[in-house]
Amino acid sequence: MVVEFKNEPGYDFSVQENVDMFKKALKDVEKELGQDIPLVINGEKIFKDDKIKSINPADTSQVIANASKATKQDVEDAFKAANEAYKSWKTWSANDRAELMLRVSAIIRRRKAEIAAIMVYEAGKPWDEAVGDAAEGIDFIEYYARSMMDLAQGKPVLDREGEHNKYFYKSIGTGVTIPPWNFPFAIMAGTTLAPVVAGNTVLLKPAEDTPYIAYKLMEILEEAGLPKGVVNFVPGDPKEIGDYLVDHKDTHFVTFTGSRATGTRIYERSAVVQEGQNFLKRVIAEMGGKDAIVVDENIDTDMAAEAIVTSAFGFSGQKCSACSRAIVHKDVYDEVLEKSIKLTKELTLGNTVDNTYMGPVINKKQFDKIKNYIEIGKEEGKLEQGGGTDDSKGYFVEPTIISGLKSKDRIMQEEIFGPVVGFVKVNDFDEAIEVANDTDYGLTGAVITNNREHWIKAVNEFDVGNLYLNRGCTSAVVGYHPFGGFKMSGTDAKTGSPDYLLHFLEQKVVSEMF
């Protein structure tokens, strides 16, 4: 009997025992850094001379791992392995596949501190964020396993005299998973193993910045007894193998989390039917956001400031759900801005091994991009707090607040993906919702209000996939807050939802006459 789903807890770091335990995990992980990691194709570990170097973004002199780089021929071999494995994997019962996934999650649970510690080094994640990432990975696997058990029952349809009908689900084939670096375990594990528990096989191309943590999942899958070829590990340069993976005639689906430019490219290329392809590809894409917190009049300004600061600067603003726009009613604008500045000054920035609140941004490209946007912000508005940058050892950007902006300013329109939040003043709630919707994106949003009519208006008109009342706009929880957005934020394939696995299944009807 499978127990009821419960979210995996984190660690309470106010308890010294947990602090000591995690410090030990960090030391143990550090001893293992710098090793070469292979491709994994049909269960075979293949080491290549050409490597992708993963480095610690907080200390660029520290090499995390050297990941073997897949070629197009390696990808072709991986497709052959996945197609062959699919022949038997699809015949496993849904319960057997789900039970194997529960074994995977149990192993991850035992290794949770190790997995989180790796993300502190490889992604620059603060302790709480890293542990939360590992826990969310467990949640996704556990949730999808139970979802598959439910879907295995099919859905009732009508019978009639002399005719019995069945409506059920079946897997669709081999697909490709392209996860992001910002949730390098949770999203990577969830988007890889959701199609797997549904009976499909996968080629996993990890993010170039975080291949080591993805390889750890491959180790765990092997330990759990996943058959060879069901998941194949092909790290590589997206310029070399990205289009090849997407275009391949055997790619039935692509799950992608990342930039708008890449997501729209994948969506476009997937629409082309290749020679030898006799199906239409499915794309499950999450492409970021320009998320806003709307602050109404007559509210708790302390709560509003805390919601803005935690949502804007948690994990250095490197969440697709991060608050990058604060849209504040004129009557409380100055007070909310002042309190937000005060809270921001209290945040610690540094190497997250030392348990700072904020760490580095992920790489030099992102560092330069964010630095440029801060300069743009200085021209468009007023720099109120932060703005400093330092890449002498790692890629550090101070939490930055820019005020006096207008809705059409670049700081308010373009995704920055860093610790920068812009403030705009509005005259009333109607204008606030207009400004909130004045973007190509529609992922998350929050409204701070005590006015029920205003909240109902936001529910009906604030055009985002995930909307929150009187809290920040980040920290969706699997099972509670299915996650996905509208417009250019993606295909709104809600992760952690009862419907998510349907993207990897076909519906079949069988009618039997008597």
From Swiss-Prot:
Recorded metabolic or biological pathway in which this protein acts: Amino-acid degradation; L-proline degradation into L-glutamate; L-glutamate from L-proline: step 2/2
SUPFAM superfamilies (alphabetical): ALDH-like
Its EC number(s): 1.2.1.88
Family of this protein: Belongs to the aldehyde dehydrogenase family. RocA subfamily.
Residue ranges crossing the lipid bilayer per the database entry: none
Active site: residue positions: E286, C320
One Gene Ontology biological process: proline catabolic process to glutamate
Name of the protein described by the UniProt record: 1-pyrroline-5-carboxylate dehydrogenase
InterPro entries for the chain: Ald_DH/histidinol_DH, Ald_DH_C, Ald_DH_CS_CYS, Ald_DH_CS_GLU, Ald_DH_N, Aldehyde_DH_dom, Proline_metab_enzyme, RocA
PROSITE patterns: ALDEHYDE_DEHYDR_CYS, ALDEHYDE_DEHYDR_GLU
Leader sequence segment: none
Pfam families: Aldedh
One of the record's GO cellular component terms: cytoplasmic side of plasma membrane
Catalytic activity: L-glutamate 5-semialdehyde + NAD(+) + H2O = L-glutamate + NADH + 2 H(+)
